[in-house]
Curated annotation (Swiss-Prot):
EC number: 5.4.99.25
Residues reported in the UniProt entry to bind substrate: Y80, Y183, L204
Gene that encodes it: truB
Positions annotated as active site in the UniProt record: D52
Function of the protein: Responsible for synthesis of pseudouridine from uracil-55 in the psi GC loop of transfer RNAs.
Name recorded for this polypeptide: tRNA pseudouridine synthase B
SUPFAM superfamilies: Pseudouridine synthase
HAMAP family: TruB_bact
Annotated coiled-coil segments of the chain: none
Length: 255
């Protein structure tokens, strides 16, 4: 089913607001940005805070005037739920990479809690090579795939909370509240080093960005169900889609 073909000819719509997309796993943030732009038939859109293909959860997408305030969200704290595999290290620090180390897991609950506490507060973190940070116009992960290591500057991060929700043998579930620019995959890798057994991320879910919480997210299937609803005409579809957006003014509420 194709919509808007006759309703719109050349120009896309002026759409303003914020969509908190619940990004599924398996695809890049850019993939879903382009998809949302087409579904909303919007002129100007942009997302805040890249989520890797393996990651899910809150991907803020700004429309129109909201893009002017994107930096406020980019600089906001984030909260994540992360599933970690102890005893295995990978070159990417997550399950998408190649296993480069296997070790026995010999740590109890007390040792893990001691480890997590050591990451609280302010520290310096070097961004991982497998990241979207750019060097001479190319993201670092492209250099990493070629086996090229690029020197990176450390950056200041702050971990407000980090605790273990569940543990089953070598699998632990963590929740972390951290500042902007924090690479959770690097923290997980460092946890593995601290425990002496290695570790990598199995799954990562972003639960919060700034003042926006998980219950405010919109599933991509919800958006598609509106778009493909045969009982709605084009104007009704656009109206229902626009109702999913959060007002631009809310971005400034906590600043």
């Amino acid at each position: 089913m194709q919509r808007y073909v006759n309703f719109f000819d050349k120009n896309r719509r002026d759409v303003h607001g914020l969509l908190l997309l619940d990004k599924p796993t398996g695809f890049s943030s850019s993939f879903f940005l382009n998809k949302i732009k087409k579904l909303f038939y919007a002129k100007k859109v942009g997302y805040i805070g890249t989520l890797d293909p393996i990651a899910t959860g809150m991907l803020p997408i700004c429309f129109g005037k909201a893009t002017k305030f994107a930096s406020y969200l980019l600089n906001s704290d984030k909260r994540y739920r992360v599933l970690v595999k102890l005893g295995e290290s990978t070159d990417t620090f997550d399950a998408s990479g190649v296993i480069i180390r296997i070790a026995d897991v010999q740590c109890n609950k007390e040792k893990i809690e001691e480890c997590l506490k050591s990451f609280l507060g302010t520290s310096l973190q070097i961004p991982p090579m497998f990241s979207s940070l750019k060097y001479q116009g190319l993201p670092l992960y492209k250099y990493a795939r070629r086996g090229v290591n690029i020197p990176r500057k450390s950056r200041t991060i702050h971990v407000y909370s980090l605790y273990c929700l569940n543990q089953l043998n070598s699998i632990i579930e963590l929740e972390i509240h951290c500042s902007k620019g924090t690479y959770v995959r690097s923290i997980v890798n460092d946890i593995g080093e601290y425990l002496g057994c290695g570790a990598h991320i199995i799954s990562l879910r972003r639960l919060m960005v700034g003042q926006y919480i998980a219950s405010m997210m919109v599933n991509i299937k919800t958006i598609e169900s509106i778009f493909f609803d045969k009982d709605l005409n084009d104007l009704e579809v656009l109206d229902k889609l626009d109702n999913l957006l959060i007002s631009t003014e809310t971005i400034m509420c906590s600043f």
